A protein has these predicted regions:
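Generic structural detector for well-ordered beta-strands
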Residues: 8, 20, 82, 127-129
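Catalytic strand-loop segment that frames the active site of acyl-thioester-processing enzymes
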Residues: 1-38, 42-43
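HotDog/MaoC-like acyl-thioester-processing domains
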Residues: 14, 86-133
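Hydrophobic beta-strand-centered segment that forms part of the acyl-chain substrate-binding groove
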Residues: 52-96, 121
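Hydrophobic core residues within well-ordered beta-strands of beta-rich domains
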Residues: 1-3, 75, 93, 107
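Residue-level signal for pocket-adjacent positions within structured domains
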Residues: 22-23, 27, 32, 70-71, ...
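Active-site- and interface-proximal helix/loop "cap" or "latch" segments in soluble metabolic
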Residues: 38, 43-57
Length: 133
């Protein structure tokens, strides 16, 4: 599963990515019947895919050879997230990740997810690291 439709901005300091949650996504069936909302764990995964995985691959590519990057896997290690809104089926979200630190293949990013109307849905810090495949 991939929760990035498009990367809008990407440099050594930040990433901005967008995703539209499909109305027929399987996780809506039981969460919640008659009033589906996107589970928090899916929102964290969405932010991690942009703010840790995609951002991390970019940062690795600045420091390591293409072969080393190809043989690296980014694993999610830590999350501290506050939720302040909800994401409904069909909503488009924009996730921003800002670099807090990157060294020894370890990345920590400040992340934030917003709806198209600017409402902040969740924010916090996520961490991950590159490991050999």
């Amino acid at each position: 599963f991939r929760f990035i439709d498009e990367i809008i901005e990407l440099d050594s300091e930040h990433i901005v990515a967008q995703y539209v949650f499909p109305e027929d996504a399987d996780f809506y069936r039981g969460h919640f019947p008659g009033r589906p909302i996107t589970p928090g764990v899916i929102l964290i995964e969405t932010m991690a895919q942009a703010g840790v995985v995609a951002f991390g691959i970019y940062l690795y590519a600045l420091e390591f050879s293409a072969e080393e990057v190809e043989n690296m896997l980014t694993v999610f290690t830590d999350a501290s997230v506050d939720f302040s809104g909800q994401v409904l089926p069909g909503d488009r979200v924009t996730t921003t990740g800002r670099l807090k630190f990157f060294r020894r293949k370890k990345l920590k990013a400040e992340v934030e997810m917003r709806l198209d109307d600017g409402t902040v849905v969740c924010s916090g810090e996520l961490s991950g690291m590159g490991v050999p495949r």
